[in-house]
């Protein structure tokens, strides 16, 4: 990718070179924040041919013969007209969205035939894209595996840990495997051939819009469509809509048709919207109230003011300052832009561009045909923009292709086959005879007469959501989601929207069963100690104890870690809870897990946080104000940003420089009641801060002083 261009609006003026009048050329705009490339067609071809294995180097000789040979090889491989020239057909093929696996050669080179030598293949969905509901992603992957199990003896079982044969991951740009993605469009995904470690894994570019190939997938609530997804585009009163709308309503409730023609079918539902419900917070899912007052100011829309993590929230009464009731606003997938310089923001309609007003996404100003919108009311003034949601790429089809690689298949030269390198949307059965012959060459045909779906295990998960209020913690998050709302509605967009929230929420956490026979005072050295929900937790070998609230017994437990956090390993190195978002980070070896309630992100490698291979483990964490955390390893610490989930690489600091007097080597570092604790063996050094100076104010025993164990 070329460097970002200066934020300058430049119009390309085409000079008239003839007295004959010409049709006015479209205005082409250099959009601020958009990566641009000045590659010539030859440079594009050389880069492409090298990347996908057709040439040994990125630059070819000037005589043109080596380029011609490479082009012929490329054209022959992909069943294109064999001209040996950089013609329009060849250039269009090079610009088409495709798989990132090389056509010639492999990511990893091994001798012999690469295939799995067992038939029950396991897979793990390590993380999720926010483009689709998790249940839709789970289903897309299960259906993709089912294509291959229907024609082979293979079965596919979902597991929940890195021991899986195939680890599925969404990532952006450089995502830890040495084969970076390239942003929106272009390279969609890649996978590695069978084997240990990263071999067999499948990675998907999360800068793409993932859908089922026919636009964003938006579930509906209430209405009369029984939760069916929106159908885009749809027709209402003779007009076509490609996003949820408030037209036809007087209450500003967003709705959509769930068929192509609302006028004919009258099937509709309400779209996720802050006027329908809020998420988490402390208002039991009640909808936003607009306008509302916060710190004396009036707000007529969701805002991130008062927060350092960028989450959009609203008050659920007219006065937050008085009532302190709030919730987080649902994401508008149908109107959230990607790319540009305002990714994640909402389109604002109408907006002004070059003096003209636009009430929908437009292609004006672009020569690539992509729809875009401004995210403020005036692009000419603010220069804030992004790409509008398009049809997206079918996660099911791309996954089925990548899983073919994960099973040992190469690209084919048959354009109609699933394993052809270029993306092609189809609603027909995607497996071609060529695909079936290839996979059965490796594993043989399915012995059963009737194909069956793969063996899978599914769980219901929820999107991670922050739970802290705009400024200070008012109350904890609700223990249960709001009760079910109405399930039926009028046949047309009603005059008033339902008052209830979505009809489903996360399931309750497993009941903990303490075993009093196991005494915390018998534990020698704990694996990790952390303050979670304002209570000190002690972790050891898959179990944990916690200090009780108020009076009564001082220590509760032990509890099984997996009863509360099922994905965690038996051995933990450290943990911390971010006081702002209530996210809980758990570290073990070179991996980190992030829990928000029952929702999980990870495990992720420490590389994702910006911690290099020299960091073998994170031995402690000290939360700091405004979403910052100090992460410790060995004799150093780094400053970590919870919002970006990245460390500042320039922040590495010796521990004794900021915390003089603590041991050189510590195994548990945690914060409790606003003081830092550094543990070594059975002892801890407590550090307090006065006038921005840290000093040890107490040295004590973990068992006797923190746990109040008897000294005899």
From Swiss-Prot:
Signal peptide start and end residues: 1-19
Stretches assigned to the Fibronectin type-II domain: 225-273, 283-331, 342-390
Main location: secreted
Chain intervals for the UniProt region annotation (Disordered): 440-519
First and last residues of every Hemopexin repeat: 523-568, 569-613, 615-662, 663-709
Any one Pfam family match given in the protein's UniProt record, by short name: Peptidase_M10
Propeptide part(s) removed at maturation, as residue ranges: 20-106
InterPro entries on file: FN_type2_dom, FN_type2_sf, Hemopexin-like_dom, Hemopexin-like_dom_sf, Hemopexin-like_repeat, Kringle-like, M10A_MMP, MetalloPept_cat_dom_sf
Active site: 402
Biased composition (Pro residues): 491-504
Subcellular localization, as worded in the UniProt entry: Secreted, Extracellular space, Extracellular matrix
Keywords recorded for this protein, A-Z: Calcium, Collagen degradation, Disulfide bond, Extracellular matrix, Glycoprotein, Hydrolase, Metal-binding, Metalloprotease, Protease, Repeat, Secreted, Signal, Zinc, Zymogen
Binding site for Ca(2+) 3: 182-183, 185, 187, 205, 208
Binding locations of Ca(2+) 2: 165, 197, 199, 201
Assembly, per entry: Exists as monomer or homodimer; disulfide-linked. Also exists as heterodimer with LCN2. Macrophages and transformed cell lines produce only the monomeric form. Interacts with ECM1.
Domain notes: The conserved cysteine present in the cysteine-switch motif binds the catalytic zinc ion, thus inhibiting the enzyme. The dissociation of the cysteine from the zinc ion upon the activation-peptide release activates the enzyme.
Family: Belongs to the peptidase M10A family.
UniProt name for this protein: Matrix metalloproteinase-9
Source organism of the structure: Bos taurus
């Amino acid at each position: 990718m070329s460097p970002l261009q200066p934020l300058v609006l430049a119009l390309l003026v085409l000079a008239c070179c003839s007295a004959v009048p010409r049709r006015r050329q479209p205005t082409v705009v250099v959009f601020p924040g958009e990566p641009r490339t000045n590659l010539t067609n030859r440079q594009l071809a050389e880069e492409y041919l090298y990347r996908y294995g057709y040439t040994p180097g990125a630059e070819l000789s000037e005589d043109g013969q080596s380029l011609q040979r490479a082009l012929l090889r490329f054209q022959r491989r992909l069943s294109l007209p064999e001209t040996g020239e950089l013609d329009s057909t060849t250039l269009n093929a090079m610009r088409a969205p495709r798989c990132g696996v090389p056509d010639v050669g492999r990511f990893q080179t091994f001798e012999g035939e690469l295939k799995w030598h067992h038939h029950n293949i396991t897979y793990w969905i390590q993380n999720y894209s926010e483009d689709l509901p998790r249940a839709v992603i789970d289903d897309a992957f299960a259906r993709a595996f089912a294509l291959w199990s229907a024609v082979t003896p293979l079965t596919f079982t979902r597991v929940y840990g890195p021991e899986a044969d195939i680890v599925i991951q969404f990532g952006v740009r450089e995502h830890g495997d040495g084969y970076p993605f390239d942003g929106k469009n272009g390279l969609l995904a890649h996978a590695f051939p069978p084997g240990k470690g990263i071999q067999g894994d499948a990675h998907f570019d999360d800068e793409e819009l993932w859908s089922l190939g026919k636009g964003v997938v938006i579930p509906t609530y209430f209405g009369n469509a029984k939760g069916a997804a929106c159908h885009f585009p749809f027709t209402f009163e003779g007009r076509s809509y490609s996003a949820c709308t408030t037209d036809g309503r007087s209450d500003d409730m967003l709705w959509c048709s769930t068929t192509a023609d609302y006028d004919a079918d009258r099937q509709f539902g309400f779209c996720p919207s802050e006027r329908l419900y809020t998420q988490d917070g402390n208002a039991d899912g009640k909808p936003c109230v607009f306008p509302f007052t916060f710190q004396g100011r009036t707000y007529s829309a969701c805002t991130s003011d008062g927060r350092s993590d960028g989450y959009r929230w609203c008050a659920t009464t007219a006065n937050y300052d008085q009532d302190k009731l709030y919730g987080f606003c649902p994401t508008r997938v149908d109107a959230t832009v990607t790319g540009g310089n305002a990714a994640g923001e909402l389109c604002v309609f109408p907006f002004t561009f070059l003096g003209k007003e636009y009430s929908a996404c437009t292609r004006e100003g672009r020569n690539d045909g992509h729809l875009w919108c401004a995210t403020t009311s005036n692009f000419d003034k603010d220069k804030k923009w992004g790409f509008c949601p398009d049809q997206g790429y079918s996660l099911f089809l791309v996954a089925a292709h990548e899983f073919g690689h994960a099973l040992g298949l190469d690209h084919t030269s048959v354009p109609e086959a699933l394993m052809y390198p270029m993306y092609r949307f189809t609603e027909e059965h995607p497996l071609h005879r060529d695909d079936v012959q290839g996979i059965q060459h490796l594993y043989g045909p399915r012995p059963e007469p009737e194909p069956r779906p793969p063996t899978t295990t599914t769980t219901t998960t929820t999107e991670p959501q922050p739970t802290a209020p705009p400024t200070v913690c008012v109350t904890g998050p609700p223990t249960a989601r709001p009760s079910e709302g109405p399930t039926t509605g009028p046949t047309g967009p009603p005059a008033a929207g339902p008052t209830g929230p979505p009809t489903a929420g996360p399931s309750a956490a497993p009941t903990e069963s303490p075993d009093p026979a196991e005494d915390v005072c018998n534990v020698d050295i704990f694996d990790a100690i952390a303050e979670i929900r304002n209570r000190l937790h002690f972790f050891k070998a898959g179990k944990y104890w916690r200090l009780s609230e108020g009076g009564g017994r001082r220590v509760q437990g032990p509890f099984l870690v997996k009863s509360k956090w099922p994905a965690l390993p038996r051995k933990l190195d450290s943990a911390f809870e971010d006081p702002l978002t209530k996210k809980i980070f758990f570290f073990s070896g070179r991996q980190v897990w992030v829990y928000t309630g029952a929702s999980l992100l990870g495990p992720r490698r420490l590389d994702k946080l910006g911690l290099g291979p020299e960091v073998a483990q994170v031995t402690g964490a000290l939360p700091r104000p405004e979403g910052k955390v100090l992460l410790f390893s060995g004799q150093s610490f780094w400053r970590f940003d919870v919002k970006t989930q990245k460390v500042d690489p320039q922040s590495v600091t010796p521990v004794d420089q900021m915390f003089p007097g603590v041991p050189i080597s510590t195994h548990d570092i945690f914060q409790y009641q606003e003081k830092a604790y550094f543990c070594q063996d059975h002892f801890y050094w407590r550090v307090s801060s006065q006038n921005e100076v840290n000093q040890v104010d107490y040295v004590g025993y973990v068992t006797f002083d923190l746990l109040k164990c008897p000294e005899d």
